[in-house]
Design a protein with these regions (language model features):
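Basic, flexible Lys/Arg- and Gly-enriched helix-loop patches that mediate nucleic-acid binding at interfaces
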Residues: 1-243
Length: 243
């Protein structure tokens, strides 16, 4: 493997930044300063260090983000803050992207990775990957709504697949409901439109689960972390190489 590719994979910087670091003699291979980006190295045997810090090669990385409201699920945008803006420089240089999208005013679990095959598998309609949302609803949701979800909500442009509506609590004095909704699709504003089709309105929407991944209770809004080994093991169900 070329040294510059190794350094980019490790999140040291972009390819052009890496060339600058090499010129400044900030990279060593087996203890010797190396300045050529074309140098061939063995990522499993050679000891590579940047600014004195030893590096370990990673082809793919996986970050779990508790996305806040007001941030869009994109890699770049001229008007809005993106989920990549919440990462540090090292994580951003891994060239990750969000797996699927959450609306700008929806918060909760979002997976970021640079593994395109895994993202494709998790988003494929053929895989029927369940997403679980918790919604605060203006209006009282009832058994009739549960049956409508089970049957498949009819929207103007789409009949939704059968889904699950669970009523967590109801405040009749305030005229509000707290519900959990499980869907396998990911159409535009789908949960909000499904609730609206029942004559109610989503006031707040949070994603709790996507496939085998769950939003950790201790992960604060706007904070991200690497997936644990247990979470990575759970992703093997998709049959995609993760390393």
């Amino acid at each position: 493997m070329r040294l510059d590719k190794f350094l980019v994979d490790c999140g040291v910087g972009s390819r052009s930044q890496v060339k600058t670091f090499l010129k400044k003699k900030q990279v060593t291979v087996n203890g010797q300063v190396e300045t050529s980006p074309k140098t061939q190295i063995d990522e499993n045997q050679d000891q590579i260090a940047f600014q004195g810090q030893s590096l370990t090669h990673e082809t793919f990385v996986y970050y779990l983000l508790n996305k806040p409201q007001g941030v869009i699920s994109a890699t770049e945008d001229a008007r809005h803050k993106t989920v990549l803006d919440l990462l540090d420089d090292t994580a951003r240089h891994k060239q990750v992207f969000p797996v699927g999208r959450l609306d700008i005013d929806t918060h909760g679990l979002l997976l970021l990775t640079n593994n395109g095959d895994l993202a494709h598998a998790m988003l494929s309609p053929k895989k029927h990957v369940d997403k679980i949302y918790q919604a605060k609803v203006d209006g009282i949701m009832d058994q009739e709504d549960i049956l409508a979800f089970e049957k498949g909500i009819e929207l103007k442009d789409h009949t939704c697949q059968p889904s699950k509506l669970e009523i967590v609590s109801v405040d009749r004095d305030a005229g509000t409901s707290l519900v959990q909704i499980t869907i396998a699709e990911g159409k535009f504003h789908q949960v909000k439109r499904m609730v609206a089709a029942c004559g109610k309105e989503v006031a707040d929407l949070q994603r709790l689960k996507m496939g085998p991944l769950s939003l950790p209770n201790d992960l604060e809004l706007g904070v991200w972390r690497r997936l644990t080994q247990e979470e990575l093991d759970a992703l093997t169900v998709f049959g995609i190489p993760l390393t």
